[in-house]
């Protein structure tokens, strides 16, 4: 059985690593199964630090398509052309894509045009905002997929409501959590590297990636200064790069700059330590919010929505948007130990990749 797994960005590798480890293990045990790992980006992508693959105990991509462009339509077309060429020269029984990037959608379209079975990890996630490119990608990928692997019952409900047959939807849990369980005891304290001398539960972790928020000068100014004021006396550790770093530095009021400790992005094991030991997490990332729920760490999501609703319903996540009053109230609640009680969502047991592999093998 030949499986092709496609990644379009750094977070994708983290989500597919457990599945690739499971497939490689099965192959070594003598089973007739093999997977190739395709990255749509370039070999020199600065977000793919060498330590990422060693940290995840994951081999590097077998093939890099080399697509690197800002225009999403151009990116989609180039990935489609190059991935079609790849598939036409390699026997493939099933293609597995993850999440909802433009590159992921491009690979999904080509897969079906080639008559190859398609599986989607993290299916059934929705923001219900069709103006967002990722929402369009999700609808297309789920609509094309032969197998939908969901992380929770709410995702199952969405997929079924949109017409997916019950027989092709599988609630397998969250592969991101498989990694967190796999990495237990392996996190590395990054504070000596930055001279921060952080204490467990004595700092806030801040991440920012959303381009629309970074570009909103007025909104960003109000948001980051609300964070800094509410967290005064407690360092806010912010691993940021590029435009996000520049925007936050410029938005902070001079008297509050000392609250934020803006550092270069850290490796996977170092970030895992920061996320697990923070008093609270402030982020616009759904993946980081999922980590916070697993770790039992309070989380403020800088959006008015989340595709990962379990983190709000039963987890530690709260949606505060960019509202300074909500942000202030939430940080006050964290500092006064008044955060809501939370639980680990169903099937966050570290066996998601195992379930996915069972389905893939059974359906071959």
Regions found by a protein language model. Name each.
Residues 42-47, 66, 144-217, 320:
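A nucleotide-sugar donor-handling region in carbohydrate enzymes
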Residues 50-52, 188-277:
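Donor-nucleotide binding loops and adjacent catalytic segments primarily
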Residues 97-98, 109, 120-121, 148, ...:
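A donor-sugar binding/catalytic signature common to diverse glycosyltransferases
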């Amino acid at each position: 059985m030949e499986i092709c797994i496609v990644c379009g960005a750094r977070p994708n590798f983290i989500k597919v690593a457990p599945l690739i480890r499971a497939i490689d293990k099965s192959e070594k045990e003598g089973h007739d199964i093999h997977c190739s790992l395709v990255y749509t980006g370039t070999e020199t992508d600065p977000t793919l630090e060498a330590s990422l693959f060693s940290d995840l105990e994951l081999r590097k991509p077998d093939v890099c398509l080399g697509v690197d462009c800002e225009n999403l339509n151009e990116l989609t077309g180039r990935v489609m052309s190059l991935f079609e060429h790849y598939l036409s020269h390699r026997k493939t029984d099933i293609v597995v894509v993850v999440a909802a990037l433009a590159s992921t959608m491009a690979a999904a379209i080509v897969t079906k045009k080639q008559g190859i079975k398609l599986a989607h990890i993290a299916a059934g996630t929705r923001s219900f905002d069709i103006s967002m490119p990722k929402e369009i990608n999700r609808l297309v990928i789920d609509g094309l997929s032969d197998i939908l692997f969901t992380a929770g019952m709410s995702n199952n409900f969405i997929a079924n409501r949109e017409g997916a047959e019950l027989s092709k939807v599988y609630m397998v849990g969250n592969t991101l959590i498989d990694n967190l369980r796999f990495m237990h005891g392996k996190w590395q304290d990054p504070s000596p590297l930055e001279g921060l001398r952080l204490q467990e539960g004595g700092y806030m972790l801040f991440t920012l990636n959303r381009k629309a928020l970074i570009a909103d000068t007025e909104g960003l100014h109000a948001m980051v200064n609300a964070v800094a004021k509410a967290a005064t006396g407690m360092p806010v550790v912010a691993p940021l790069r590029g435009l996000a770093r520049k925007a936050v530095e410029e938005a902070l009021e001079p008297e509050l700059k000392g609250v934020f400790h803006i550092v270069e992005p850290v490796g996977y094991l170092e970030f895992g330590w920061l996320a697990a030991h923070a008093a609270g997490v402030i982020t616009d990332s759904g993946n980081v919010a999922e980590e916070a729920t697993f770790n039992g760490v309070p989380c403020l999501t800088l959006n008015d929505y989340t595709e990962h609703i379990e983190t709000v319903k039963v987890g530690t996540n709260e949606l505060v948007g960019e509202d300074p009053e909500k942000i202030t109230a939430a940080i006050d609640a964290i500092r006064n130990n008044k955060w809501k009680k939370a639980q680990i969502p169903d099937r966050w047991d570290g066996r998601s990749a195992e379930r996915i592999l069972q389905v893939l093998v059974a359906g071959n």
